[in-house]
Amino acid sequence: MARSVWKGPFVDLHLLKKAETAQEGGSTAPIKTWSRRSTILPQFVGLTFNVYNGRKFVPVSVNEDMVGMKLGEFAPTRFFPGHAADKKGKR
């Protein structure tokens, strides 16, 4: 079920404050965050976030196409190495 329109998008306040100060100061340093649940807002465009995926911080550069999505969508938590190849000489 989708979030109600009247509530608006969810963003952690500490992340919003860090993004506003980075925009005002013109800082290019990435913003480190654990908040994968925060929605990407239009004022985040052009910023870089380091999003934690449970093991390391993944750099996420925000562009216009990402607005409305969550930060966690761009930092995968699981690694799939692929299925094993068939063994040809098995008989």
Swiss-Prot record:
Gene3D superfamilies: 30s Ribosomal Protein S19, Chain A (3.30.860.10). InterPro entries: Ribosomal_uS19, Ribosomal_uS19_bac-type, Ribosomal_uS19_CS, Ribosomal_uS19_SF. GO terms for biological process: ribosomal small subunit assembly; translation. GO terms for cellular component: cytoplasm; small ribosomal subunit. SUPFAM superfamilies: Ribosomal protein S19 (SSF54570). Keywords: Ribonucleoprotein, Ribosomal protein, RNA-binding, rRNA-binding. GO terms for molecular function: rRNA binding; structural constituent of ribosome. Protein S19 forms a complex with S13 that binds strongly to the 16S ribosomal RNA. Belongs to the universal ribosomal protein uS19 family. NCBIfam families: rpsS_bact (TIGR01050). This is Small ribosomal subunit protein uS19. The gene is rpsS.
